């Protein structure tokens, strides 16, 4: 393992200004308040060789293209770095205790019988068959489950791997079920060892009239004691990026076929940057979504410039140098986690037009109770609006430096 000074790693050529997207927040202008044991800390673990698919042969999920040992080490290192602990066991203990302390449950750790739901991003899976399209990595998911059980002391039957709106593919189910047969799997289809997702209606009522946006939430999400948001590192034609905040959409009672779903309040005004209510702020601030999350994780072992299809292309700029991103980003702070992922994507593909104003949801969430839109964010519509920033957001400068956000880069 090798820790490198970020400025040395990212000695990059200056990009042409016109190629840069228009954003609401300038570099090194932090907004909000950091969350976590170490407020605003983000772990970036980079392990070249964890993903090696050639982009053409068969499916990227096959074992010959992925290194499980590296994935295991990455997840354990990410958890240790976020918690500031010397072992994965100590890290999980610290994370559970910090969560419970900040949620009014006392200074205690994980207790047997408490359930932990891991929300995957299987947006490109509508059957249980493996696909060439990019979804949650079977290797990162197994690594996360292994660490929770073997390091965190969580019982198998208390771990729920879920994707309420899509299908959990065979490569994920088979790999985990073979090793941990009591882990529960819940997806949109059910069958083949998976439990079909059920929903509680009218759980998220939104802070404004949000049209036909889904308002039900998966029972496995609502009933869990803790959540882990395991997202992907991808661009998106609508909101610009799809990271941990967008991943919550899949916890609502949307249709398996995405064209049948509403997407109100998700995308920014890409042409003029006119401020507008952002649905993702309600998801981050909801008591049974972002506010119940123990850990935010972005799986960037492949990473992609495309929301659909196979992962592509390989990453060209340093430190990737024509390889896959081979990275995991993790934090207790939902805004800090997403802004680091966003900065990585923007740095690699600055010409992507949908990046314009993609940071609006982060600005809104970081400036509660006085966001630029003037919206009073009250996700449950219970008359108890959010009264404080939901985290810390700050864009890096050209040398990948932050001033308040603490980014720790670890190369393995």
Walk through the language-model features, giving the residues of each.
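Bacterial N-terminal signal peptides
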Residues: 7-14
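General helical structural elements
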Residues: 6-7, 123
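Sec/Tat signal peptide C-region and signal peptidase I cleavage site
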Residues: 15-19
């Amino acid at each position: 393992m090798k820790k490198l000074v970020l400025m040395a790693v990212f000695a990059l050529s200056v990009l042409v200004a016109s190629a840069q997207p228009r954003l609401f927040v300038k570099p090194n202008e932090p907004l909000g308040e950091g969350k976590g044991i170490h407020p605003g800390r983000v772990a970036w673990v980079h392990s070249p060789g964890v993903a090696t698919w050639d982009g053409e042969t068969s499916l990227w999920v096959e074992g010959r293209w992925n290194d499980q040992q590296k994935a295991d080490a990455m997840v354990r290192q990410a958890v240790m770095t976020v918690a500031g602990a010397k072992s994965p066991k100590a890290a999980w203990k610290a994370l559970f205790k910090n969560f419970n302390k900040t949620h009014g449950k006392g200074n205690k750790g994980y207790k047997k019988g408490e359930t932990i739901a891991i929300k995957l991003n299987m947006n490109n899976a509508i059957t249980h068959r493996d696909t060439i399209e990019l979804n949650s990595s079977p290797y990162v998911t197994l690594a996360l489950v292994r660490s929770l059980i073997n390091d965190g002391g969580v019982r198998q039957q208390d771990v729920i791997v879920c994707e309420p709106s899509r299908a959990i593919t065979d490569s994920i189910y088979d790999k985990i079920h073979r090793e941990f047969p009591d882990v529960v799997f819940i997806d949109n289809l059910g069958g083949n060892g998976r439990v079909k997702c059920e929903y509680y209606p009218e759980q998220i009522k939104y802070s404004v009239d949000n049209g036909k946006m889904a308002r039900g939430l998966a029972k496995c999400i609502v009933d869990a004691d803790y959540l882990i948001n395991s997202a992907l590192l991808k661009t998106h034609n609508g909101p610009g990026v799809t990271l941990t905040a967008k991943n919550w959409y899949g916890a609502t009672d949307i249709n398996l076929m995405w064209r049948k779903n509403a997407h109100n309040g998700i995308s920014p005004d890409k042409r003029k940057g006119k401020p507008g209510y952002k649905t993702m702020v309600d998801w981050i601030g909801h008591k049974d979504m972002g506010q119940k999350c123990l850990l935010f994780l972005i799986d960037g072992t492949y990473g992609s410039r495309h929301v659909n299809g196979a992962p592509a292309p390989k990453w060209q700029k340093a430190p990737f140098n024509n390889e896959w991103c081979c990275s995991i980003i993790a934090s207790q702070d939902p805004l800090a986690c997403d802004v680091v992922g966003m900065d990585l994507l923007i740095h690699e593909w600055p010409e992507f037009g949908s990046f314009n104003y993609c940071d609006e949801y982060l600005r809104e969430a970081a400036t509660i109770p006085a966001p630029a839109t003037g919206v009073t964010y009250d996700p449950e519509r219970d008359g108890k609006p959010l009264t404080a920033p939901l985290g810390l957001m700050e864009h890096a400068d050209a040398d990948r430096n932050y001033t308040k956000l603490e980014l720790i880069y670890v190369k393995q």
